[in-house]
UniProtKB/Swiss-Prot annotation:
Task performed by this protein: Small polypeptide acting as a regulatory molecule which coordinates cellular responses required for differentiation, growth and development, including leaves shape, pedicule elongation, inflorescence organization and fruit maturation, probably by restricting polar cell proliferation in lateral organs and coordinating socket cell recruitment and differentiation at trichome sites.
Keyword NAD part of the UniProt annotation: no
Protein keywords: Cell membrane, Developmental protein, Membrane, Transmembrane, Transmembrane helix
A Gene Ontology cellular-component term: plasma membrane
Gene: DVL2
Tissue specificity note: Mostly expressed in stems and, to a lower extent, in roots and leaves.
InterPro entries: DVL, DVL/RTFL_small_peptides
Protein name: Small polypeptide DEVIL 2
Gene Ontology biological process terms from the UniProt entry: negative regulation of cell population proliferation; shoot system development
Cellular localisation: Cell membrane
Family affiliation: Belongs to the DVL/RTFL small polypeptides family.
Organism the protein comes from: Arabidopsis thaliana (Mouse-ear cress)
């Protein structure tokens, strides 16, 4: 039987992993949006 401490540790690990995945997704979105904005700004003819 697992102790409460090890259970909480596992819970924290999964939360941080979830947060990391979320942040990585957001970074990707921001990068894509920045690229689009730069292209729009730089492509004025």
């Amino acid at each position: 039987m697992e102790s409460i401490m090890s259970l909480k540790r596992k819970e924290k690990k999964s939360q941080s992993r979830r947060l990391g995945k979320y942040l990585k997704e957001q970074k990707g979105r921001i990068y894509i949006i920045r690229r689009c904005v730069m292209m729009l700004l730089c492509s004025h003819d």
